[in-house]
């Protein structure tokens, strides 16, 4: 019954708003406006005039022109107030019939919450000291035919927030702030890399072969060529071809696609930063990564001391650097430095209730121990390095112990934020790694990479020692905006089809 009443109320509101739209048309007013030039944004008005006393503002008699969405409206008779919001913030307007004229005042009286108005008037302060634009002329710019979400409670339905992000941005200023910060974070990352002599490039989204990461790809079909293509799962292999070509320092910020599950940390399409620098090794890339994250934090937040989900995170101090095997030993007492067979590793896994796949080697089990017992304990920024060779097909083997690679992952608050390594530049070793991955695929690992012959051929022309980095931009934005879910930092996250839409179809 309540649902039917709500629907009737909505239908009544839609009807009334359309009647008001028709009234505007009958009065010769375009309800959907045209170009409008303003002199100030709301924030600029506050910045310029907030400190000026009321009487001084009256003497100044400064005319301004603003535009925005009407978010609240109050008053009666011949006088009214409203709050106007633009992209920078909110400002109050004061409308008097004897100031704007009867015809112009009709526009204000007929305006609903959500409508866009243009206002010209004098900047003033009320007796309560609130900065206000006293209107001398109103221009109708756009009629909202649907009502906004409840002005007192905002938009709180999580599903609706994600499906109708435009309503979320209207109703929840903190969401607008989060996405504004996202843009600034990406700009800061670019600024840091540009000033360190990196060149931004663009590489193909459609690949003839999926590679550069262990993930299941999306497959599409090119009709003209009659071939299957893959949406990229990583940026890596094309960027390293550019290192072979002599570009030496390159980066790309772009969308990648992985045909996998959806949760608070994963979305099928997400934004990656990858950088490659000739003559770097994985330790140089640690320094680079600290610099990028610290610079972005200070640029956008003004500090390296942040809070994420109630936990203080220190981005100003040097990030810890711990070998994966040492981290496992510290938490469990299990010593994977000791040489061992697959059977011995499986026995240890059984004793510690760590699940494993039939095709796994010792290195896979080491990584499983890390994920099970260590990952969630890493609160402060920590580089975990020395990943097993079995799970690192594109990383260079460690010179002192070839069971491990010169690879690391960065963890904070139990989450991974970056992955990097000294790149494997030996084409013979690379082919052997690809072949091992192909064998894993045959044994049931559908995320294993195949053999990319063109990439191996590129390496045969000679790639200098290179340090490569991948940072998940979405997770970095989550960290710096204290967002609990990746969906909170994606304007339009992937969602299950809405039941109502399916029923209509």
Curated annotation (Swiss-Prot):
Its EC number is 6.1.1.6. It catalyses: tRNA(Lys) + L-lysine + ATP = L-lysyl-tRNA(Lys) + AMP + diphosphate. Belongs to the class-II aminoacyl-tRNA synthetase family. GO terms for biological process: lysyl-tRNA aminoacylation. Its cofactor is Mg(2+). It comes from Latilactobacillus sakei subsp. sakei (strain 23K). This is Lysine--tRNA ligase. NCBIfam families: lysS_bact, PRK00484.1.
């Amino acid at each position: 019954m309540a649902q039917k009443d709500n629907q009737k109320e909505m239908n009544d509101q839609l009807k009334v708003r359309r009647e008001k739209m028709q009234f505007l048309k009958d009065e010769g007013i375009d309800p959907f406006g045209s170009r409008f030039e303003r002199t100030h944004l709301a924030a600029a008005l506050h910045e310029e005039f907030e400190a000026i006393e009321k009487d001084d503002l009256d003497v100044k008699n400064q005319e301004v022109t603003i535009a925005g969405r009407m978010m609240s409206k109050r008053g009666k008779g011949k006088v009214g107030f409203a709050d106007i919001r633009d992209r920078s913030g909110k400002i109050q307007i004061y409308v008097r019939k004897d100031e704007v004229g009867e015809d112009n005042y009709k526009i204000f009286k007929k305006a609903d919450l959500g409508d866009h108005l243009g206002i010209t008037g004098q900047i003033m302060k009320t007796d309560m000291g609130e900065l206000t634009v006293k209107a001398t002329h109103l221009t109708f710019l756009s009629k909202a035919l649907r009502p906004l979400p409840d002005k007192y409670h905002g938009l709180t339905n999580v599903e609706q927030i994600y499906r109708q992000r435009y309503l979320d941005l209207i109703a929840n200023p903190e969401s607008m702030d989060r996405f504004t910060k996202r843009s600034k974070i990406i700009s800061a990352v670019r600024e840091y890399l540009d000033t360190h002599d990196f060149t931004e490039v663009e590489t193909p989204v459609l690949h003839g072969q999926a590679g550069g990461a262990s993930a299941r790809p999306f497959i599409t079909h090119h009709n003209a060529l009659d071939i299957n293509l893959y949406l990229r799962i990583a940026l890596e292999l094309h960027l390293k071809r550019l290192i072979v070509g002599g570009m030496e320092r390159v980066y790309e910020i772009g969308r990648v696609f992985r045909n996998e599950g959806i949760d608070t940390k994963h979305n099928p399409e997400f934004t990656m930063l990858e950088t490659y620098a000739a003559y770097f090794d994985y330790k140089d890339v640690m320094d680079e990564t600290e610099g990028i994250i610290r610079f972005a934090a200070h640029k956008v937040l003004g500090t390296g001391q942040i809070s994420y989900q109630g936990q203080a995170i220190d981005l100003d101090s040097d990030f810890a650097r711990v070998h994966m095997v040492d981290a496992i030993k510290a938490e469990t007492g299990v010593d994977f430095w000791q040489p061992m067979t697959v059977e011995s590793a499986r026995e240890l896994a059984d004793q510690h209730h760590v699940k494993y796949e039939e095709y796994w080697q010792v290195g896979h089990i080491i990584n499983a121990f890390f994920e099970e017992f260590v990952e969630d304990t890493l609160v402060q920024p920590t580089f975990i390095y020395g990943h097993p060779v079995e799970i690192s097909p594109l990383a260079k083997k460690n010179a002192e112990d070839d069971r491990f690679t010169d690879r690391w992952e960065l963890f904070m608050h139990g989450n991974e934020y970056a992955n990097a390594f000294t790149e494997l530049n030996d084409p013979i070793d690379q082919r052997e790694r690809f072949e091992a991955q192909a064998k894993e695929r045959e044994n049931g690992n559908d995320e294993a990479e195949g053999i990319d012959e063109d990439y191996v051929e590129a390496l045969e022309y000679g790639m200098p020692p290179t340090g490569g980095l991948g940072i998940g931009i979405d997770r970095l934005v989550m960290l710096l905006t204290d967002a609990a879910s990746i969906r909170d930092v994606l304007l339009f996250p992937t969602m299950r089809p809405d039941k109502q839409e399916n029923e209509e179809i």
